[in-house]
Amino acid sequence: MSEEKHEIGLEVLGTEECLQLLSGAVIGRVAFQADGVPHLLPVNYAADADGTVVFRTAEHTVLESVGGRPAVFEADGFDAVNHTGWSVCVRGTGRELTGHDTTARRLLELTVIPWAPGQRDRWFAITPDEVTGRRIPLVRAADFGWIPGVVS
């Protein structure tokens, strides 16, 4: 775990921790541009040990446009009671998985179960150029001399 901090108190996560967090979540968001319009869509996904993110979509959806384009995938988790959380971003290029190469066949073996109803037979991956993450750590108010909700 990285001990590096932003000046605003966020912990910068190392690659290994980012990959571990990605492997434990099942929903994330894919951001990309199609026809000059930015899109940000939620997906069920799986990630491999290298941070490649795999998701499924139906025929004739805007998600098909991610193939061959720059894309960003984001997954996160939070604890609303303790005001902590994390976010991991995978920046890379999207591609459709057709099973015609060894990597595609391996990625198609990952378990991705869409929550939304309907058939989703098109598989896509975002191959990472960069994996980054941040965490909002548990902070005790007393450490900073303030109490939430109290104005002095």
Predicted features and spans:
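Structural motif
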Residues: 51-52, 70, 93, 130
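Short, basic/aromatic recognition patches
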Residues: 3-29
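Short active-site loop/helix that positions an aromatic residue
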Residues: 67
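Charged, gly/pro-rich active-site loop segments
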Residues: 2-9, 77-152
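Short beta-strand segments
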Residues: 25-58
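Short conserved beta-strand and strand-loop elements enriched in small hydrophobics
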Residues: 30-31, 70-77
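Short hydrophobic/aromatic-rich beta-strand segments that constitute the beta-sheet cores
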Residues: 54-56, 73, 133
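Short, surface-exposed beta-strand-loop junctions and turns on beta-sheet-rich folds
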Residues: 36, 61-63, 140
